[in-house]
């Protein structure tokens, strides 16, 4: 997820099964206020990105990467999703 515009209140990407980092430097990138939301919520900062893999090499989902886009309370958020389709053992087809 790439944040193209994040001039907003709210609108983060929440991973409820991740543990909050303990180092204060992370507060530039994640919501550190205790608002009752479980897990880690990445702030929608323009020019920043979050990468995660949804599946392991066997195609099983990672429970830790269950996530949700939180509501934008005010302002504008524009994000760009980039899906990676690499699978272990994949052999690309012939070049065109």
Predicted regions mapped to residue ranges:
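Catalytic core of non-heme Fe(II) oxygenases with the double-stranded beta-helix
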Residues: 1-96
């Amino acid at each position: 997820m790439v944040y193209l515009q994040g001039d907003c209140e709210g609108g983060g990407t929440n991973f409820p099964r991740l543990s909050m980092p303990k180092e204060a430097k992370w507060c530039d990138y994640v919501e550190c206020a205790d608002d009752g939301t479980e897990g880690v919520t990445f702030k929608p900062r323009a020019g920043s990105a979050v990468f995660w893999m949804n599946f392991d090499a066997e195609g099983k989902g990672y429970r830790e990467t269950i996530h949700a886009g939180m509501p934008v309370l005010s302002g504008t958020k524009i994000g760009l999703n980039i899906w990676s389709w690499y699978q272990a053992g994949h052999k690309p087809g012939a070049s065109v």
